[in-house]
Amino acid sequence: EEKNKEIVDSINYAKRIQDAMMTSEGYRKSVIPKSFTFFKPKDVVSGDFYWVYKDQQENIFFTVADCTGHGVPGAFMSMIGTSLLNEIIVEKGIKDTNKILDEMRKQIIKSLNQDTEDDQKDGMDISICKLNMKKKTLEFSGAHNPLVVVSENELSTFKGDSQAVGLETVDIKPFTKHSMKLKKDDMIYIYSDGYQDQFGGDNGKKYMTANFKKLLLKI
């Protein structure tokens, strides 16, 4: 019982560290006032994370990521992810969304010594956006994860590249950047696979992506 208490205490402390590294609600709302997050981890600590940053050129970067592993292993990867975003965007000043993901992948492979295809395939699926409200422009890059834009009640999906941020058996290719102009009242959504992968309802089936997109149209 004492051992179990130590483990629980350690996990709760890890949650405090993880929470401290994620973007606070106050900062997010100050940067993107009409925004929301829905974050309900299955475990105390999570492999999913989100991050927001506004630079001096009025560019707002926001990202949602889903790291390999659940619970504690996923949480460790999420902390690596938030640290790398700070290093790449804030310190190094890399601003193109595709180059940010290229650099993240390079750093993760290097930091986890993923030199060969036989090594552990740790990494993350991620969506990253760069929004400029004055110019009404949006750039997006994704590793597996998509971007959804709802404009005039029409939903458009921009797919991420079919590769993770990490080492995979497929040939590594540079990430793609999607650029678009936004209209007034457009809604932008990025998300992990958690919501649509939920089992439930009368038949205990997966919620699925199609139902999730219908839900987004109702918001």
Predicted regions and their residues:
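… and, occasionally, acidic/histidine-rich disordered N-termini of signaling adaptors
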Residues: 2-188
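C-terminal catalytic subdomain
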Residues: 178-190, 195-219
